[in-house]
């Protein structure tokens, strides 16, 4: 488990609790306690908002909540209970006055569900809005990207093609949706990269990564350094070279023990590539002049 990070710890702007459909081990109160132990200045509870009905086969079905798998074998993510979530945030703000607690959502594929996403954002004031891509349309429907590496992908789809398709769709998401401020986990496919293919090398996909980063920088938005896995440092370097102005740190924790995971190493890496703490402890990290 992480030890106290210290006074220079960045905020954790990507955290899930029991209010996200895939965080059965989540607890907002326990996560707040852990954030204070680590010395985090603030935390953003960015709960999932997903509307994509994913194709599931074999092992993938067994890993999902069974009550959400339809008779057609597709998965229907549960809807966020906005009122219950906001009430829980207020209880935690009262209980943990020394921790700045931000509201937030992680919009899955917001460019595919613009009306739903816009209506959700109008329903309540959210401090942090992440845009994320978890899915790709292949053959008979949308597939979770990490599941495509498990041998259940349509015939002929290779790991390299999954990564390139993912990054191409991420460009389309940035260019066609202005509903989010922070791009979450640009390296999401790395989570499922097959060991048989050797270590993941981002340089093999440099052109595709740079296309995403140029689009994001041109829109004035923020790149997340997601610490679920160590971010390939090349990506942060390309972000700086693309004119990116800001970085957000997110553990993507789905249980309290993982909040702030990997932040000390990630902060050192980000600083070595030209970014530093912003205007105050609660700000994004900003590009050095």
Give the residues covered by each predicted segment.
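Short, acidic/polar
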Residues: 24-34, 111-120, 165-174
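An N-terminally biased module of ancient metal coordination in phosphate/nucleic-acid-related enzymes
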Residues: 1-111, 191-202, 211, 250, ...
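Extended hydrophobic/aromatic segments used for targeting, binding, or gating
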Residues: 228-264, 268
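Short helix-capping segments at alpha-helix termini
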Residues: 94-99, 242-243, 275
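Short, surface-exposed connector motifs at secondary-structure boundaries
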Residues: 97-102, 215-223, 246-249
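Domain-core and long-helix interface of multi-subunit machines
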Residues: 19, 107-111, 123-126, 131-242
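Hydrophobic residues within beta-strands of alpha/beta enzymes
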Residues: 43-45, 129, 183, 223, ...
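Mid-to-C-terminal alpha-helical segments outside catalytic/metal-binding sites
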Residues: 261-289
